[in-house]
Amino acid sequence: MKVALFFVEKVFPDEQEKFILFEGTAEGKIETGMFCRIQLNRSLGMTVPISNVARLSNNKVRLHTDFEEQEDFEIVFLMNIGEETFEIHDSE
């Protein structure tokens, strides 16, 4: 069930590829434990848990997505900032 949208404005990848921080604007309530769908390239995407949500201002938030539990993969993308939108779900 989709509960929010998140519009990406900045991306902060981790060099060891264990997590990515996304900063942007939220429409709807986003909480720790929800999931977001991340598209790694045109044909490969994955659903990952949101492990932390930091409120920066009104509807500005920073999401910490954790890949520690996911299978090994290589982050092969950097999003089109301002054009990427995530659907946030309350279940996987």
What are these regions (language model features)?
Residues 2-27, 35-92:
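Beta-strand/loop-dominated core regions that host nucleotide or nucleotide-derived cofactor-binding catalytic loops
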